[in-house]
Every structure is written in structure tokens, then in C-alpha cells.
Amino acid sequence: MERDLTYNAPKIKFTDTEGQEEHFYFNRSNNSTNDLTSHDSSSTQLQDANSRRQAPPPPPHNPFSDNSHENSTESLYQSETRFHQPLLHNDSNNSNSSIGNNRQRIPSQQHDTSSLYSASPISTSPLVSNFQSYSDNQDEMTRGKYNQNTNRSSSNYIQHSPTSAGYDRYPLKTQSSIGGSMSRIGLSSSSPSQQQQQHMYDNNSSNRSSYSPDSATDLMVYENGEFSPFGGYPASLFPLSIDEKEPDDYLHNPDPVQDAEYDKNRFLYDLKTMDKKSMNGLIAFIVMFLIAIAIFIILPVFTYTGYNPKAKNFENYEVLTRYSYPRLSAIRTSLIDPDTPEDALFWKSKNGEEWPLVFSDEFNAEGRTFYEGDDQFFTAPDLHYDATKDLEWYDPDAVTTANGTLTLRMDAFKNHGLFYRSGMIQSWNQMCFTQGKLEFSAKLPGYGNITGFWPGLWSMGNLGRPGYLASTEGVWPYTYDSCDAGITPNQSSPDGISYLPGQRLNKCTCPGEAHPNRGVGRGAPEIDALEGEIHGVIGRVSQSLQVAPYDIWYMPNYDFLEIHNSSITLMNTYAGGPFQQAISGVTMLNVTWYEYGDHQHNFQKYGYEYLNDDESGYLRWFVGDNPTFTIYSQALHPNGNVGWRKLPKEPLSLILNFGISNNWAYIDWPSLVFPSTMRVDYVRVYQPKDQINVGCDPTDFPTYDYIQQHLNVYQNVNLTKFEDGGYTFPKHKLIGC
């Protein structure tokens, strides 16, 4: 591809044969170097210059031409035709001109440059450049006429060295006599009509070349003998100079100031010159960034703060406790489970009254977990139950709900240095009740004739947290409202009847001492609906009330106890010990109520019903719908140096656990099966219509404030003494205030 050498070409001075100077500029239109436009618009000067032009002499003979034709210029042209398109024959206005052997190549308008090249076997070099120019008379153009200029003959001829095997790359100049030391390069000029005819002729003849001697030429003057590496142009007039600007100058001519400005404002410059594709990418990135902000920042903020622009109509619900939990996973707003069947909404009491259901949990939701804060009503502790020297570790992982039941699973799984793992849930400080009917439906673990397991369904006063020994010291299992020897350590008896430290929250606590409601004896009594054991080859359940202080020999007044079916129920031979008095009865169980065995595996109901009135109160236990035995409030009358023990008036929390301990029963290790699971179908609580009292912080027996003031003993399971939590036993009147 030929290079356009006239880009940003300088102004060139031309001189005609008479020495008259004319000023021309290279025409930059269409990237062509063929036309030169005169800056002098005077038609008179142009006509005078044309009249002074003379026809050029014939070019010298080229002895190195491969063509035998006498015209060397034509030979040059013919040798070059394989590199260029056919030339036009300019004979439109000068039909009588002498064509003869004086032919010059007329530049093709389809090329940027029109030059003759030597047929060098290696490269081609420009030999002669023919420039076309024409001037228009403005007045004649208006009238539709053109000024036909006479052809300007070129006086620039090239003489080749006879020693060259081909065309010389840097030919010698044959200088004109005009100007002495000046050489002239011919410039051809033709009228617009001639150019039009040349174009028409080019369509008819592609191989014919001719030249009209009438085409005018101008002479470009330059210093004699100046070396030119460009084959005909002097170096001083080469149109491309290092000082001239080109479109690609910014690639190899860095501008420190402009570059610094660009680096400083790179983003703005790139933004201004950004194409459509890049702009779409930027918009997509911004949209994705905003979406990420909304998902990972705004949404979590709204979720954490509970923001909701929509108004909610909250249902009324009963407040169980003022304790604030970190997270409420249960979705219930009622204490009664909506899955509870309608025929279980009422219970017929001992006196024939119908008590409504006030709380239930059917455990029908699959996959419930009971880690701290997971559930609305129950929590599975993560601890070792050291109070009874259990052999298992209670782990929340062992507790879940499946197939409509709560499952407490015991595995031979090493955990915290113990060889067994099992589960417990408790409603301490979450769900409590005072008076009423408590009912569990459960399937006991293992076989009905293999001893070792210790399943339990029971309740305890909310002032003591099961498994936290520091919290139960001095309150379990006290249910006492007197100020006598019963509140003192060991009941002030040297015979070892009691190892208890005394009632911590007694009736006669000194003013200013810590107490939930000073003037009332408080404690954490225990009522067991079920403690499973095996007697011989048959299972049985122990149901009991555990109280303090104790009767002499732990014997209540049995005149106020009633056994309803002596064929299956009898009083327990174990009546208590140094740490508690147990009014207990045992009832035989059916082997079909256990997990394993060659028989049906059914659920059975276990529970109790009680009223805590001092005169007419009672406590009755049940297996199924049948009562087993009943204790009346008069059975706990004053005895020895202690006064009345009360049927529990404390709010009672619920405990469901599956343990194993040598302190409870003989363990038949070879016969036990692991894993074994205790399943609970439901828990239900009924209360008299006029005495509904659900909650862990009732007005007459509050617990919340006291627990908050002594959180250390309720949250640190490793504390075994109340004083270990940083507290002291309150003083009372018997020892002085």
C-alpha cells in the first residue's frame, strides 16, 4: 500500500519559466497527493503564467530499458504497469498535440500517489511524481464555463547510470538551464472537463497509456545538489516533518503534563470516552453493588430491629414470666397447643368439677431443638446431674421431636469424661403453674423387666433450678412457713435426721436480707409424677411428694393417706433420708408400656392432681385415668420440734429426664440395650376455673426479682454451694438480726 506523503504538507513555493513565483498548497482531500491548489485566486496571473510556459524537451534515452522502444519514458511506464492500474489517455482538449514519443504517466485517481518506480528486483523507489493542479475562474464557473489551461511541460528528467543492472534507486538529476543551479519538477494541470474525460476513458481502456503535451506543469525550485533519499524530492521539502502533528503522535510523543492530568482524573476521562458496552458493564456493576448492600446490610438491620411498616393486630396472651430471652423460636401465642384434641380440653377433678386446660404441648412439630433460647417453654440443659450422681451427661443433642413425640435418647457415648449421654428438658423460669392437674403421656425406655434405667417426669419449685446445686441449697425440698427449729441446720437435732443447711428463705428473715417476699417461708418442693424402676421381673412407678423439714423417722400421719387399689399400689418402704422426706407410693406397670418386648408398645398416662389449701388440700396421683393414692394436707401436721408442712404453694416448673444411676436402682449392665429412648406424647395442665395460676412469678409467691439478684447460682452449674456464688445466707430472728 502506497503511503500518502502529503499529510500535513508545508506550503511549497513554485516558479514558472519566467521566474514568477506562485504559492501552492498540497490538496489534503481524499488523502491524495495528486492535486495542488493555488493560493493566488487571480485568473489574470494564471493566464500570464500559462502563456510563458514552453513545451518540455524530449526525455533522454534510457540505455538500460528492457524494451527496445525508443521512448525511454514509455519504457519506464510499461515496466511499471504491473504495479498500477491502467492510465488515462488525456486527449480531450488537445487533439492536435504532439503525442509522439513524449509520453508521461497521468496519475490514476484511484491511488493516493502517482509515481514511477524503477523495476528493482528488490524494492521500488519513486522516480517521478506528477502533480495535477488546476485553477478555476470564479466568474466563468458561474456561467458554466471552465478555463482550459495549457499543459505545463516538466523540465525534471532523470538520467540513469549506464552501469546499473536495472533502474537506479537514487537517480541523478538533469538540471534545467533556468535558474543556474535550480532544478525543476514538472507539475501537470488539467481542467475539470479533462479529468472527467479521463475517468470516462478509464472505463473503456484499461491497458492504454497516453499523455497530452498540452497538460501544463509547474516547476518546484530547490537547492542544487541537496541529497534526497526519497527518489526525486529534496530532503528539505519532504512533506512529513518531525515537528508536524499526526493523529498517532500521542502514542510515541508522551506529554508529561497531559499524562499527569489524565492520571489525576482518570475516572472522569474514562467515563467521557466510555463505549456502550463498557457503560452497560458499569451500570450492571452498580446494580449488583446496590443489591448486595440491600441483602447483606439493610435486610439484616431490619430483621434484627424487627422493623415492619405494616401494623399488626396482636392477640392477647398470658405472661408466663418477665424474663427476657434472646430468641423465641416457638411460634405459639397461646399456652394451649392447637394440636390438642377437643376431648382433652377439660379434666374432671376429684370433687367432680371440670377444670379447663390451661397449658399443653403435643410435641407434634418435627425437629424441635431445645438449646438455650431455642424453645418457648422448655430448655435442654448441658450438664452432669451431680445431685444424684448420675452416670450420664445431659446433652441437648439427645433431645428432639419426631413422629409426634418428644424423644430423650440414651447412648453408650462418651461425653465429658462420662460413658453415657442422655437428655433432659425443663421449663424452669419459662412455664410454671400453681395447683391443678399435671398429666404426661409417655412410653418408658428399655424392657419392662430389666432394671437399671431411671426415667423421670416431675416438677419442682421455681426458686431452685434442677441440676444447679448452688441454687437448690437451702430451698429444696422446703415447703415450710414457720419460724422454729425446722428452719435451722439439721433441724437442730444431733441424731442426724437431717443434713440440710436450714431453710434459706424462711419466714423470720431479718429486715434488709435478700428474700423474695419477706415474712413468708419459701422453698422448692418436689412432686414426682413418675420415677421408673423395676421390682423383680416387673416394672413399677414411684410417685411421691418430697418435703422438708422432716417428721420423726420420716413418717407422716398415714391416717390421712388413701390407697385406691391395694392390689397394684402400696406405700413405698423408702420414706426418706438425711436430704429429703418422701411420701411415696409405688404402682405396678404393664410390660406393654415399655419400648422393647414381644408385645405392643403403648403410651400410658402418669400425673397428679392437687389443691394446696391448708384445711382441705390434697395431692392425688394417677396411672392412666385411675388414681393410685392420695395424701391430704392434715398428714403433714406438726411433729416433734417442727410445725406444719404445706402442700406446695410455690409455682412449679416441669422436668422430663432419662437418667441412669447406682443411687437409684441396681443396674443390670449385660441386659440393658443401648440406645434406648424415652418418648413423651404430650404434657397437659388443668386448673380450677376460679384458681387459674400459670406463670413462674405469681404475685403472692414471686420469684423473678430474686432470681435476677442471684443469677450466678442459677447460671453456673459448677457451683455447689450458695456462698460459692458470692452470696451469704440471710440472717433470721432465731440467730439474731
From Swiss-Prot:
Region (Disordered): 1-215
Residues bearing carbohydrate: N403, N449, N490, N565, N590, N718
Family matches, as Pfam families: SKN1_KRE6_Sbg1
Cited function: Required for synthesis of the major beta-glucans of the cell wall.
Domain GH16 intervals: 348-691
Name of encoding gene: SKN1
Species, as recorded: Candida albicans (Yeast)
PANTHER family: BETA-GLUCAN SYNTHESIS-ASSOCIATED PROTEIN KRE6-RELATED (PTHR31361:SF1)
Biased composition (Basic and acidic residues): 13-25
Designated name of the protein: Beta-glucan synthesis-associated protein SKN1
Keyword Mitochondrion on entry: no
Membrane-traversing stretches: 282-302
Biased composition (Low complexity): 90-102, 175-215
Keyword tags: Cell wall biogenesis/degradation, Glycoprotein, Membrane, Signal-anchor, Transmembrane, Transmembrane helix
Keyword Iron-sulfur: no
Disulfide bonds: none
Compositionally biased residues, Polar residues: 27-53, 103-136, 145-164
PROSITE patterns named among the record's database cross-references: GH16_2 (PS51762)
GO function terms (MF aspect): glucosidase activity
Lumenal compartment residues: 303-737
Matching InterPro entries: ConA-like_dom_sf, GH16, Skn1/Kre6/Sbg1
GO annotation, biological process: (1->6)-beta-D-glucan biosynthetic process; fungal-type cell wall organization
